[in-house]
Design a protein with these regions (language model features):
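Glycine/proline-rich, positively charged
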Residues: 1-78, 83-86
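Structured C-terminal cap/extension of enzyme domains
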Residues: 65-79, 83-178
Length: 178
């Protein structure tokens, strides 16, 4: 949501989560968001046990702060867009980067069986965040970091022509990476 659901805010969302937990339908209350300010508000509220937020090696310093706050507050961090919606094409590098955080669980967004096989192979033979991998990360940051479309789709409902704005905005980057 575009806000942080809280008890008594009039939406009933947080109360519904509490009810679902009391009924045993869920074990934890978490929040998923793409907005940094909403994510930080959720962490500071003390109401949530997990945060699901876009996080990969293209993340900004402010996004890294979310990981630190989650660690400090013992809140689970689920990293969505761990491959940045297809912009990050080297799974070995992405895996090594995410593995440095003991409190981050990435969602890889596997689309092909071969990709799944790659990630499964890292369980027994995990890549290490060495100088070679760090160099790849730095190169990708120079090429890709900044104010690029992260593919969340929040802009889509606003287009009266129903243009897939997120895909159009990312096309030049995706073509360059292919």
């Amino acid at each position: 949501p575009s806000f942080c659901p809280k008890p008594g805010d009039g939406t009933g969302l947080y109360e519904a989560m509490l009810e679902a937990k009391a009924q045993g339908k869920i074990r934890h209350i978490g929040i998923t968001n793409h907005r940094l300010n909403v994510a930080m508000e959720a962490l500071e509220s003390g109401l949530y046990e997990t945060l699901q937020f876009p996080f990969n090696y293209l993340a900004t310093e402010k996004e890294h702060k979310l990981v630190e706050v989650c660690r400090e507050k013992n809140i689970g961090f689920i990293a969505m867009k761990a491959l940045s919606g297809g912009l990050i094409t080297n799974s070995k590098v992405a895996y090594a980067y995410q593995a440095q955080y003991d409190n981050v669980l990435p969602i890889w967004g596997v689309q092909r069986e071969t990709e799944l096989d790659e990630f499964i192979s890292y369980i027994d033979n995990p890549p290490v965040l060495d100088e070679e991998i760090k160099a790849v990360i730095e190169n990708d940051k120079k090429e890709l970091a900044g104010n690029f479309c992260r593919g969340c789709g929040y802009c889509m409902p606003t287009c009266p022509a129903h243009i897939e704005i997120n895909n159009c905005a990312r096309m030049s980057l995706l073509l360059r990476r292919s």
